């Protein structure tokens, strides 16, 4: 971040309130729009800014992820998402997000070995699972168990020590697939499957999800490749609701396990992490291709309350760069599994075709997003809808941890404290109960 310059001069923005003016510096990032630094605004003019939901506010500096929603660009540490998804392993992306650069061979081998050594859970956590009902939602189990990890691994709770931060980061990223898979097994009444040192991150998750004690399990390479892609595509997405929650909690100095649990809780909200499940429900409700025109008409009717799920994005005003990769992956998975003429996929393709050619959606820039196809892929792989958001959390933990570390290590980091515009009652005097 640096001060913006125009014709050799530092750029400023003049803000006037009630006849008084103040010059606010304009800051430039590596990419993206400039921002106005308004930190001195209250002192100079006695006012705050009002931006509900922080939609137009940069709350932090970050070197991790860049999004250009107008152009459909997503970069991790400068690398386009399509290049990473096509060429990298998820472990490489973990290293990249945490450390800023892709690893060389020696670094990669050391890193993956360390990651593998942290996949096991404390044996007492098996007993912790028994406290949940068998019909508990897997996200409830995931959130509760991750939040409890600080009780099982208290040795790294002092985050002022860099080595502790690194240890906590590795533990969280390595253990969350195990917790997630065990949450699924617990709800199914099946025996827990332990992680294997001979499998990579994506393969291990599939093994712990679908292997059984009674027979050997061989990971399908096509499904492993698809899982690797899904993990990479969901690894980080800048300052979204759950990431901002992690940063807000982390700014208090809370232990990293509690911070990630807070992020999981935020992700659980249907407006954030449940979009791919909503797509499946929408397609099931449509039923068949012949019903699409009537459904589209309902979507256009503001009074119907019907929404087109899987299209449009809070940030992307162009095609979601992750959606094209998901579309390709969807076809690969269905072909590998021998699923032909899948009714949901046929519906999805036809719905996409109609929506992309309809002026109503084109003018509003409602393009398919990553959730449009991911739900179909996960369903085909045998992952139940109750686990969709859990898988999202597994992938996003890398981003959360990276963002948390970046925030903690930022010079001058302090507790986050948003302001408000108070619209309640003015000051008034207490009236005794008998006189009310």
UniProtKB/Swiss-Prot annotation:
The UniProt GO MF terms for this protein read: citrate (Si)-synthase activity
Its domain of life reads Bacteria
Q: SUPFAM superfamilies given for it?
A: Citrate synthase
Instruction: Output the GO biological process annotations, alphabetical, semicolon-separated.
Output: tricarboxylic acid cycle
- List the catalysed reactions: oxaloacetate + acetyl-CoA + H2O = citrate + CoA + H(+)
The alphabetical list of record keywords is: Allosteric enzyme, Transferase, Tricarboxylic acid cycle
Q: Name one GO cellular component term.
A: cytoplasm
Q: Which Pfam families match?
A: Citrate_synt (PF00285)
Task: Quote the InterPro entries the UniProt record gives.
Answer: Citrate_synth-like_lrg_a-sub, Citrate_synth-like_sm_a-sub, Citrate_synthase, Citrate_synthase_AS, Citrate_synthase_bac-typ, Citrate_synthase_sf, Citrate_synthase_typ-I
Top class in the EC scheme: transferase
Q: In which pathway does it act?
A: Carbohydrate metabolism; tricarboxylic acid cycle; isocitrate from oxaloacetate: step 1/2
Q: What is its EC number?
A: 2.3.3.16
Say yes or no: keyword Cell division present: no
Q: How does it assemble?
A: Homohexamer.
* Something else known: Citrate synthase is found in nearly all cells capable of oxidative metabolism.
Q: Which family does it belong to?
A: Belongs to the citrate synthase family.
Q: What is this protein called?
A: Citrate synthase
């Amino acid at each position: 971040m640096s001060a913006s310059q125009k014709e050799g001069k530092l750029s400023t923005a003049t803000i006037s309130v009630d006849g008084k003016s103040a010059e606010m510096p304009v800051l430039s990032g590596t990419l993206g729009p400039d921002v106005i630094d308004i930190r001195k605004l209250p002192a100079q003019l006695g006012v705050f800014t009002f931006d509900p939901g922080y939609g137009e506010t940069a709350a932090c500096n970050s070197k991790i992820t860049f999004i250009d929603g107008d152009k459909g660009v997503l970069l991790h540490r400068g690398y386009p998402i399509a290049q990473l998804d096509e060429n990298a392993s998820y472990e490489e992306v973990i290293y990249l997000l945490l450390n800023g650069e892709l690893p060389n061979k020696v670094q990669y081998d050391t890193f993956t070995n360390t990651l593998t050594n942290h996949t096991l859970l404390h044996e007492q956590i098996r007993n912790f699972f028994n406290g949940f009902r068998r019909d508990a939602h897997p996200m409830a189990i995931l959130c509760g168990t991750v939040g409890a990890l600080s009780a099982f691994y208290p040795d790294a709770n002092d985050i002022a020590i860099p080595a502790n931060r690194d240890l906590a980061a590795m533990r969280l990223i390595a253990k969350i697939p195990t917790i997630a898979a065990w949450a699924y097994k617990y709800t199914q009444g099946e025996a827990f499957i332990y992680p294997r040192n001979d499998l990579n991150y994506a393969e291990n998750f599939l093994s712990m999800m679908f292997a059984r004690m009674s027979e050997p399990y061989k990971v399908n390479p096509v499904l492993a490749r698809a899982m690797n892609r899904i993990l990479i595509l969901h690894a980080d997405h800048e300052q979204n609701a759950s990431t901002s929650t992690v940063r807000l909690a982390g700014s208090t100095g809370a232990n990293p396990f509690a911070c990630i649990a807070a992020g999981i809780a935020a992700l659980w909200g249907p407006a954030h992490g449940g979009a791919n499940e909503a797509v499946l429900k929408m397609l099931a409700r449509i039923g068949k291709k012949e019903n699409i025109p009537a459904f589209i008409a309902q979507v256009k009717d503001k009074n119907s309350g019907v929404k087109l799920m899987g299209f449009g994005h809070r940030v992307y005003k162009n095609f979601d760069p992750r959606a094209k990769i998901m579309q390709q992956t969807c076809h690969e998975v269905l072909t590998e599994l021998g699923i032909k003429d899948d009714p949901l996929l046929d519906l999805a393709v036809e719905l996409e075709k109609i929506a992309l050619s309809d002026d109503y959606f084109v003018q509003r820039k409602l393009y398919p997003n990553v959730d449009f196809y991911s739900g179909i892929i996960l369903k085909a792989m045998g992952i139940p809808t109750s686990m969709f958001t859990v898988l999202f959390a597994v992938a996003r933990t890398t981003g959360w941890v990276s963002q948390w570390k970046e925030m903690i290590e930022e010079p001058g980091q302090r507790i986050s404290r948003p302001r408000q515009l108070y619209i309640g009652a003015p000051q008034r005097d207490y009236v005794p109960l008998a006189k009310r």
